[in-house]
Amino acid sequence: MSWRIIQKTPRIANLDEMKSYVKLGVIVLLVACFSFETHAQNIIPKPQNIVKGKGTLASSQLEGIMSNLNGKDIALLKDYIPQSISQELNVKKKRSVHKDSGCFLQLVCTGTPQQAQVAADSVRLQGYHLRISDHGVKIEALTPMGLFYGLQTLRQLEENGKFPYIAITDQPKYPYRGIMIDCSRHFFPIDVLKKQLDAMAYYKFDRFHWHLVDGGGWRLEIKKYPRLTEETAYRTQEDWEKWWNNGDRTFCRKETPGAYGGYYTQDEVRDLLAYAAARHITVIPEIEMPGHSNEVLWAYPELACGGKVHGQSDFCVGKDSTYQFLKDVLMEIMSLFPSSYIHIGGDEAERKTWETCTDCQREMQANGLKTTAELQGHFTEKIEQFLNSHGRRLMGWDEIMEGKLAPNAAVMSWRGFKAGLEAARKGHPVVMTPGEYCYLDMYQDAPMTQPKAQGGFVTLEKTYGYEPLPDSCRTPQTEAFVEGLQGNVWTEYISTPQHLEYMLYPRALALAEIGWTNGPKDYAKFCKRALHAVAFLQQKGYNTFDLVHEIGERKEFVSGINHEALNKRVTYLSKYAPKYRAEGDSTLTNGRGGNWGYIEGRWQGFIDPKGVEVIIDMEKVTDIKDIEINFMQQPASMIYTPASVQIGVSAGGKDYVEIDNTTCDIQPSAGYLIYPYRWKGHAKGRYVHIKALLHEPDSWLFTDEIIINRK
């Protein structure tokens, strides 16, 4: 193998300038068509501009490699070259170092070292131009990162040792394209994470958000505070639901019989960081504060309000010792992780103990704070000042906007998109990751056919349909500050590497394309490429979702329901929860059935002690022949079928005749299901009174449509 230094190379400044090379490629390649029937149609993410020529290049024709890269940059790319072309290249004779003609793989970097250092934050610096002809393969880019992405495209173009004649000009849509894996609820060894980094690099992700600590256990060695891993890296049960919801949330030491868990040594972290860097992936650590910290308070109870521990998850933010602890931890984090962003969580802090804590109240009074939300904002700003003083930036979930948003903070918007847009308009960097599209721990197909998951329903098609910055919200300000998007995998119900991969792929591939490719979307074409990618990943040993046999959306969601109570007025005697209002008072008779998940906007949720109690006005006395009501059960979210369903009818709306009182004997142990209540008989009335009682106090009832006399 010959590594040739090229002294003079053309400069490629940006995507528009690079397009001129595509035009040149059209002439050189004598392109006559724009079909993508073979190699090119399977690329994920789809390149911005592809021009396909006639003919193919066999890898055996390549005589060597030429590059103007030196040192570590070429060493990092070298590992991908055999995977990109063919093993046969290694047996070709060396070429003379003085001869330029021939058939080579050329890797040409046209930028500066300074540009290479900031490439992760620039779409232009991640771009590349790839051309394949009878003269060989030429990849040009401003940075090694761009060359790396060109090689990933080249790898996807190969078929049986051949490459199509083609010209590609490409750069990402967003600079931030991330995946988050929760390693607290369940611990995943370094080798498992490396395997996912391989797939992420192949599909051009460039951020790995590492959720290292949470209520499930502390997973990172901190030398100054060894009790974090000695006492809370292991817990007494593997099953999350039993341990968290039904157990005593007890941690234990590694040597305890039945101990479950693990942690990463600092040397293991350095190893993973080097592995990620070689694939141009920045690793962003997350250290949760001030909430989600019950594992810390188990090991160091003095950091809790009142020094109490069990049942508390918030740090005492009024103690100097809390800030000193967090600064010490963050110093070790910054010594390990070179990322500009340090994620501090900031989500779902309960703040209850702060209301009565002497130290917290003193902190509020001293700083003129009126609410505990403002106290959290004050806490976040102090942590941000510390990070900024060390050249880092704070990132947090969108709850950090409550009270007061720290002046330099970046926001990760997970509760929809409004918070992210608000932050961007105020000049804060934003990463979009709304749960209804980007939470890959939710069901991806009919739940009764799937392993246990979170209660939402996020299909490949739904994820692919997401747009982080739709045209209606696009302004120069939002374009400047929405940095990209991220898919998240929370692992409460994901305990094995196989299950982790099953939830990631292929939905992560949809996010890869959303973050990279401009222009209109075509799900049918993307799905074909995803099917090809699934087969490839399975061949490489990944346990993917079976996209070939996908059931898809619930028929009631797609087709609607026609019945005699359609659009009839509903009077609510119990209140639905505002968060799960669906379509408001019209929900239960609008003919629109819900999908498989309870959060997509058609299932109405009730936690009222009365359960579900409504009256439907049929507008005239009607012969009632059948009544159908579907109730969802999702035990992981405290959603159960009703204890009983009572039906009464009335001609005038005052005196009701009971026509049914059915006890539902579905147990929570049955898992996810949609319970179909059915009544058939003969009754007459204008008003139909329906009452469904809660399975147990503080549980939820969800229903989507009350169907009377289906047509």
Segments (PLM) and residue ranges:
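Aromatic, loop-rich ligand-recognition surfaces of beta-strand-rich domains
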Residues: 596-660, 671-711
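Bacterial Sec-dependent N-terminal signal peptides
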Residues: 1-42
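Predominantly extracellular/luminal regions of secreted and cell-surface proteins
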Residues: 559-593
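Flexible, acidic glycine-rich loops studded with aromatic residues
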Residues: 394-399, 404-409, 415-560
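Contiguous, structured surface segment used for ligand recognition
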Residues: 41-174, 499, 515-540
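Active-site neighborhood of glycoside hydrolase catalytic domains
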Residues: 305-306, 310-407, 414-421
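Feature activates predominantly on carbohydrate-active enzymes
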Residues: 120-324, 329-341, 382, 386, ...
